[in-house]
Amino acid sequence: MKLIHTVAELREEIAQAKAQGLTIGLVPTMGALHEGHASLIAAANKENDFVVVSVFVNPTQFGPNEDLDAYPRTLEADCKLAEKMGANVVFAPSPKEMYPSADDTWVEVTGDIPKVLCGRTRPIHFRGVTTVVTKLFNLAQPDRAYFGQKDAQQVEGLKRMVKDLFFPLTLRVMPIIREADGLAKSSRNTYLSEAEHTAALVLSRSLKAAKAMYEAGERDAAKITAAVTADIEKEPMSNIDYVEIYALPGLEPVANPMVGSNLLAVAVKFGTTRLIDNVVLEEK
């Protein structure tokens, strides 16, 4: 496996892979890789001939008071995991490499997708995501790109972007990977104290209970979100940002009664750490 840092090197690697007729899988990450990322890289390795993992803590998706400087950076460990899972190249550019101009060119999905859920408190976040992913798509020219369902709102934005900008690739969205105790894998879990980690288990428990309500026939979104909110509020260390349901695709307002496919998403702070989780509620 090769570790590379420049756009020129990545272009060279991709040109060689294309010349050999290899299919390319891209796994965009911000590093601090865990089993969730490992599952994406393994899927990319299974479905493509040549796998690129990008490791880039993208400054444009962090707001002024967010954790850009504190975000974990573990490139050596990331490379070991990527290699073990079958990556051919790890692309770890500097911010200057990815944003060469003094002024920026933005790729932005408009409408509801970037405004609801996390978009209310992180107004520039999704613009940063769609811009950096566009750059990575242009550089790696993948046949398939891999993302986790945990970042469901990001996935909806990227699906819209791929469709609207005619990117010739398939977005592969892989299931949420959880710890044995149910907590969704996240690079930010490393910030949690032991007590906060235990408290955060209320997220997966409350989503599981909501899914059971839905499967038992409940179709009133307000009743489901109220039940989840009540569950989470029983945990004294929790500080809820949102508990909401939107229709899929596109995070449209939910119908009452609920029909089709719907996303139940939560964002909750434990101490200073904000965690997200979700479950899709749909007819079997």
Show which residues each predicted segment covers.
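Phosphate/ribose-recognition catalytic cores of enzymes acting on nucleotide-derived substrates
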Residues: A227-K284
